[in-house]
Design a protein with these regions (language model features):
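Non-transmembrane functional regions of envelope-associated proteins
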Residues: 2-220, 253-293
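Substrate-access "cap/lid" subdomains that shape
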Residues: 208-250
């Protein structure tokens, strides 16, 4: 009788776990995956530098967001040999009138701008590099959004590239472990920010996507080797990289991918990752290097 009561108790406990979490296997898999990420030895990355708009910069330049002629000033002072990735959304005209100054600075540098998915319908989708599709239609597999917040034409037409900063947190943990390289918005396909950074970095002009009966199989940047993805065009992000971080007030190094983002307290929302909270531009840096390596 004791044996049967033990079995019954075990069944009740397992049923309770199943009700509390309909997919305990998935949760265990996430725990294992996160532990693996946390145990990896950090690798120093030399070709990507995080440029932080930090407390010192806010104190010097004033409340954020800044007038865009201030951003233009830092671009003008930086080396022409670097690639500038601005992980901020310029979807409306600068009320201080700095757009023309930023546009002129962008003409002198290689700059990639950000867009962001939105739940609001949007007309038109800005200036993006298109994605050629091979095989099956991937429409039912790609993450789809009603619209995009995209940079104003004054800026996007001066940029080398524009990409979407889409990340899909895993349920039920809310942790970002992977990111889509291609998304759909307003009925069309668009590259992620990290993917477009790689396109500009490699000097390629276009993308292609191969899909089959089970979803997306790979994405290719120009003539580069295909990047194998899951069915939803996602890749896992390797978070064991270590990047040099500098203030935007510091001299900007040359021959680097410079990824700009806000770290000043109260101005940015950190993203949950398997190794702890990170600022959004740091997540982008890990994603870029994951694909590079």
């Amino acid at each position: 009788m004791t044996k049967w009561w033990s079995v019954l108790f075990t069944i009740v406990i397992l049923a309770g776990i199943k009700i509390w979490n309909p997919d305990p296997v998935k949760s265990l898999r996430y725990i294992q995956y996160d532990f693996f990420q946390q145990q990896q030895e950090q690798v120093q990355v030399d070709d990507i530098v995080l440029v932080n708009i930090d407390e010192k910069a806010i104190q010097q330049e004033g409340q954020y967001p800044w007038p865009r002629d201030i951003v233009a000033k830092y671009l003008n002072e930086g080396p022409a040999e670097s690639l500038y990735v601005l992980n901020m959304i310029y979807s409306e005209d600068d009320r201080f009138g700095g757009d023309q100054a930023l546009r002129e600075a962008m003409f002198l540098k290689a700059v990639v701008l950000s867009s962001a998915p939105t739940t609001q319908l949007s007309d038109g989708v800005g200036n993006f590099v298109g994605v050629a599709t091979l095989g099956k239609d991937p429409k039912g597999w790609l993450y789809e959004f009603p619209g995009l917040l995209f940079p104003i034409d004054t800026l996007s037409t001066a940029a080398y590239g524009v990409g979407a900063t889409a990340s899909i947190p895993d349920e039920p943990t809310g942790v970002v472990r992977r990111a889509p390289l291609i998304i759909r918005a307003s009925g069309s396909q668009y590259p992620s920010l990290a993917l477009d950074v790689l396109r500009v970095y490699t000097g390629e002009p276009s993308y292609s996507l191969k899909a089959g009966d089970n979803g997306v199989e790979w994405i290719r940047i120009g003539r580069q080797d295909p990047i194998v993805t899951d069915s939803f065009a996602q890749v896992p992000i390797a978070y064991w990289n270590k990047f040099e971080q500098i203030s935007i007030l510091d001299p900007l190094p040359k021959d680097k991918v410079l990824i700009f983002g806000v770290t000043a307290e109260g101005y940015s929302n950190p993203v949950p990752t398997p190794v702890g909270a990170m600022y959004p531009h740091e997540v982008q840096a890990h994603l870029v290097h994951t694909m590079l390596s």
